[in-house]
């Protein structure tokens, strides 16, 4: 693990504060196993297939969680260049340890601010299950695409997934759980819908694609 630099280490958003070491210890089975499959109705296999379709050998993971999907994905090269970027140190440390065999470089930064890191650009950037935790609606959240775009090579792809509130089929558990998460400010997606996501992506990227699986939008766009 190469600890390249620390930027904006203060964690003030509830969506970040929720990711404690204890939470991360049960995150894979509770959130990715139960919630994603039964409540959001987007099985992990769909996310993994999306990863494998877009992952490059020169990759930046943003909002790293526990590294679950990267750990189960297949890079197109034996020795990929992998970087991890997150505001939460707990997430960075857990994921870097899990993916230590790739010797990832880690960056601690707030993607809501311009990202001032000195690094060669990447061929792929993933923003998986991050947007629904960011404050505001897509006109405000969309600035993260502007901040990440300079980190992509020409032709590079930004992809990811986010849980939407509007324009998706939400069953009773999804409505109740989403309301609770928004009340606790772990989520901030009460105004998030597909049209808003598409508009935010198209403002900064080309060849934008958005597909819905349950309550989840799988999205991609290129520089």
Regions found by a protein language model. Give the residues of each.
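Core SAM-dependent methyltransferase catalytic element
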Residues: 203-223
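Conserved class I S-adenosyl-L-methionine
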Residues: 2-54
